[in-house]
Each structure stands twice: as structure tokens, then as C-alpha cells.
């Protein structure tokens, strides 16, 4: 990623190349330091929810949907196929190492991966009543 560290109007344009993750962490750090009092506030970093595209990740049949799921995943080692444990670990480690302030990571990715019974496509207001055939296959 190329970042312009000067004004467009400045004759001496300074362009820096860096990884997008580094740019994100740098920008977040600057904002937190400028906008928050670490003695009065806490910083939380929330990961993303899994995509929920593969019912097979929750023990369901391929091609089916989340309709009528009533129990969460009980296996604490469960991890969806489209989520990376390594990436979640790296996020926490990177934030710990790079930030000049305490950052608490809310691992929504892992937390929501257990909840096949709470898939939002089942609980939204439908145009017509849900049944096994009409519930969204992809969520």
C-alpha cells in the first residue's frame, strides 16, 4: 500500500509504502492516543463474525440451511473452515506488541462460531413464514 504523508498541494510529496495491516495499526494508534484518556477508558478490538456459509462447519448436511437448529456447538475446539486460528492469535500478539496502550481483543470470530442455533437469518422478519425449504441457505 502506498501512503501519501504530505498534502496533495505540497511540492515535496512524501509517499511511504507499507503493509495495509501496519497502516491500520498506525492509524488506530494515532486516533486512540489523540482521542482517548487511557486512565478513564478502555480500548477494545473486535474481530469479525465468521461468514456462516458452510452448514457443514456446524455438523449439518451440505446444501441445507440453519433452520430448526436449537443447540450451540459444545466442542470447545470447534473452528469453522473459513476462519484462521493463527490469524486470531497474531492479531492479539500484534496489538499487544505494537500498541502503547492496553487493547482488549474481543474474539467474536470464535464466540459466534459456536452458535449455529442463533443464526440471524432465522430470526429476522420474513416475507413469508420460514420452513425448512424457505430459510436462507447462506444466511
Swiss-Prot record:
InterPro entries: TBL, TBL_C. It comes from the Eukaryota. GO terms for molecular function: O-acetyltransferase activity. Pfam families: PC-Esterase. Belongs to the PC-esterase family. TBL subfamily. This is Putative truncated protein trichome birefringence-like 46. The gene is TBL46.
